[in-house]
Structures are given as structure tokens and as C-alpha cells.
């Protein structure tokens, strides 16, 4: 097969700019000028006869064509770099980039990564924490661990675990109320969806929060629990992910009522080619989660 001309410089410029959504950062990474990155991207767009970026006031947004091209280039450049490293060091190593919501990272994954390292010593995990709205294309992630129902367009999702949600608060706050109806006097803390509290009140047999009740929303359950420990209010979160706080009695679960509203999912873009290292990580994690649920 005779390959057509491959514009490597343009592809490198696009990959760096798309991964960081910034021509300036791409120029710094590749040690060239901003103008050089712009020219290379423009040349690639002309060659492909399509736009790869949409320029907006806040920066750059990838077009559909750009989103399709970026993971292929991420994977290709990673493979080239890994192969060169293998030749120079004689050691075959692979990388897996995993984005994970902070709750699952601190409550489960971090304490078990050593087991994976022993299971697959040739694989390096590059871990970053995020909220559910992470841009896997811009971040160059192989996998994203999210909370919800797993329904994501253009993604392959594997269910892992659905811990129920319960009230968690500082011990000092729990002494100031008894039945669930007393909660109307306190600030409610939520993560992502205020309606989760309505579901909990319904499960407890009480009325939904009144329109006048204050609900403080967070984009991270970890931050929400920090607020709960600071006695700002009462959090609705999965106790299973905060056992270290419960064991140390920095927070308590005042009521036994729980509600199940979602779960943790291992997700991957369908366009993201699954490498052997990615498969090793996915099989290990899903096996661990299956054992957890038994």
C-alpha cells in the first residue's frame, strides 16, 4: 500500500493545540511561535477540506471532525513515543490516561492502584480528577470514570458500582435535630442535582424541601464533604465512598434512610482505539468492582 503524504508537522501542531485547546500552550510545548501553530493548523484544515476548530471569545472549540481526529493522533503519537522509549531503554511500558470523579478516586481507586501495579507492572496509570462534565477529547483520556446512569452519546459504558446516598454531617450538627422533618432548619448540601434531596425526603416519608430552604450545590462531592465537616450544612452523599471520614467520626450518618439514584461507570469514547494496556486496566477494575459487590 502506497501511503499519501502525511503532514507530520501539521498533525503535531493540531494535536497539541486540540489537546490543550490553546495555540499559545501548543506553541510553548513544541517550542515554536504562535503564528507557526496557526499556520500549520490552517494548512491541515486546507488539506482535509474541513474546519478543525471553532474560534470563540473564550478560546477554541473542536469541531466534530477535530473531535474525531484528536483521539487517533493521541493514540498514534503515544505509540510512537512508547516504541522509541522501548528501543532506547529496552523496557516495554504502556500508559493509560484515566480521568475519575474525585469521590471515586479518594473513596476507592487510589487505595487499590498498588494492586494494579503489581498485576500489570508494565503499565503506567496517568490519573486526573474531574467532575462529570470532563471533556475526554480535550484531556486526551483513555477512560473516564463518571457518576450517573451511563447514558453517554458516542461512548461505551461499563457499569461498576451503585452505592446508595445518605445524609452525612458533622457530629455537632446531628445533636441539634432528631426526625427528618427537623432538616428544614438546616442548609442542605448537594452535588450536581438538587432533586436528589427531594428523592431522599420521599424515601424517608417526609415532604420535599420547601422552596425557602437553602440548598448549596457543589460540582464535587469531595468539596461538599469538606463543607459538611465545617458544619456548613448536611450533605447527601454515598457513605461507602467516605468510610475514612465515618471511621474517624469526622462525619456521621444520622439516619439509616438511603436512596439509590445512580452509579459509577467506566466510559470510553467509541472512537478511542483500545490498547492492550487499556484492556488490562478495564478488566482489572471491573473484576475488582464485581468482587466488591459480591
Swiss-Prot record:
Location(s), subcellular: Cytoplasm
One GO biological process term: DNA-templated transcription
Entry keyword annotation includes Ribosomal protein: no
Gene3D superfamilies referenced in this protein's UniProt entry, alphabetically: Periplasmic binding protein-like II, Winged helix-like DNA-binding domain superfamily/Winged helix DNA-binding domain
Domain HTH lysR-type, first and last residues per copy: 6-63
GO molecular function, one term: sequence-specific DNA binding
Feature: DNA-binding region: 23-42
Main location: cytoplasm
GO cellular component terms given for this protein: cytoplasm
Keyword Nucleotide-binding part of the UniProt annotation: no
Keyword vocabulary terms for this entry: Activator, Cytoplasm, DNA-binding, Transcription, Transcription regulation
Family (UniProt): Belongs to the LysR transcriptional regulatory family.
Record function comment: This protein is a positive regulator of gene expression of beta-lactamase (AmpC).
Protein name according to UniProt: HTH-type transcriptional activator AmpR
Native source organism of the sequence: Yersinia enterocolitica
